């Protein structure tokens, strides 16, 4: 019994160490929406994001959803020239006039 517990503990520790850290997706994998260049990307629960969401009357399920603040679309021309000096993201909801984009994932250009 103790051998099983030790084996399981070692296996879980090895798995935790061997699991790679999440990184930004490549820009070519943006299948949920348009590429955006956002000044900041933060959790929806952050003070600035929650204030903007509240003012717009937007309710988000889950506080760990990433939102982009002050975003603009990245065009093909902008992509070729590295046209985003802030945070490039792929967001599921860009319908708020660039003020806030919802459901964002960081991408690498």
UniProtKB/Swiss-Prot annotation:
Keyword Endoplasmic reticulum found: no
Positions of disulphide bridges: 30-90, 37-84, 38-71, 91-104
Subcellular location: Secreted; Secreted, Cell wall
Listed Pfam families: Hydrophobin
Top-level division of the source organism's lineage: Eukaryota
GO molecular function: structural constituent of cell wall
SMART domains to which the protein is assigned, alphabetical: HYDRO (SM00075)
Predominant location category: secreted
Biological role: Aerial growth, conidiation, and dispersal of filamentous fungi in the environment rely upon a capability of their secreting small amphipathic proteins called hydrophobins (HPBs) with low sequence identity. Class I can self-assemble into an outermost layer of rodlet bundles on aerial cell surfaces, conferring cellular hydrophobicity that supports fungal growth, development and dispersal; whereas Class II form highly ordered films at water-air interfaces through intermolecular interactions but contribute nothing to the rodlet structure.
Quaternary data: Self-assembles to form functional amyloid fibrils called rodlets. Self-assembly into fibrillar rodlets occurs spontaneously at hydrophobic:hydrophilic interfaces and the rodlets further associate laterally to form amphipathic monolayers.
Stated name of the protein: Class I hydrophobin 2
Species per Swiss-Prot/TrEMBL record: Lentinula edodes (Shiitake mushroom)
């Amino acid at each position: 019994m103790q051998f099983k517990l030790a084996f399981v503990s070692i296996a879980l520790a090895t798995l935790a160490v061997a699991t790679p850290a999440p990184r930004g997706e490549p820009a070519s994998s943006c299948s949920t929406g348009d590429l955006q260049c956002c000044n900041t990307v933060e959790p929806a629960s952050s003070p600035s994001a929650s204030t903007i969401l509240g003012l717009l009357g937007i309710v988000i399920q889950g506080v760990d959803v990433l939102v982009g603040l002050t975003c603009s679309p990245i065009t093909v021309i902008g992509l070729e020239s590295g046209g985003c000096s802030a945070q490039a993201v792929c967001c599921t909801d860009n319908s708020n006039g660039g003020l806030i984009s919802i459901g964002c994932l960081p991408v690498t250009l």
